[in-house]
Amino acid sequence: PVHLSLAFNPSHLEIVNPVVEGSCRARMVRRGDRNGDHVLPVLVHGDAAFAGQGVVMETLNLAQTRGYGTRGTVHIVINNQIGFTTSDPRDTRSTIYCTDVVKMIEAPVFHVNGDDAEAVVYATQLALEFRQRFRKDVVVDIVCFRRLGHNEQDTPAMTQPMMYKKIAAHPGTRKLYADRLVAQEVIKESDAEAMVAGYRKARSEERRVG
């Protein structure tokens, strides 16, 4: 069995990172898990916060230390290419990629297209295998988009009209993947529709999915 603990993430972006690392380190000590075989920290980031929040660098700096290291963390960056109202990389950071900050600890980064579901799974599996083999941090940069605004009052179409014109015309990742499976004759179109209906029904009835 796998025990999963989700840390409470406040509105202060990325501040939960050292909390997760400290919790995992404590669990490793309690279990006598010196090599990180049984405890795995996973951090989910946004692209703008990952590059912009100082606590990210502070946490990375402790990654390989004897007193605070957790034998490698898997970082998942949800790169929706927009930080509030700034979408031009020339205005958001001084590096090409939002993940360039991990060069400070020489962690590998897998950049993957969020529209390719199987590629995302493969990259994540590869990242986990790297962590288990080398016991170092690793990053999966999922390049995708945000359909709606940052919150109920945010309308990105006002500040990013060109970007959101393209997003509005995008069918969605699920539809793209379903169409691909139908084209490959893996499933029928009716199967895809039934899966969506079944999932929504299960969620509305508070039943376990999968």
State what each model feature region is.
Residues 1-106, 110:
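Cofactor-binding active-site loop characterized by glycine-rich and histidine/acidic residues
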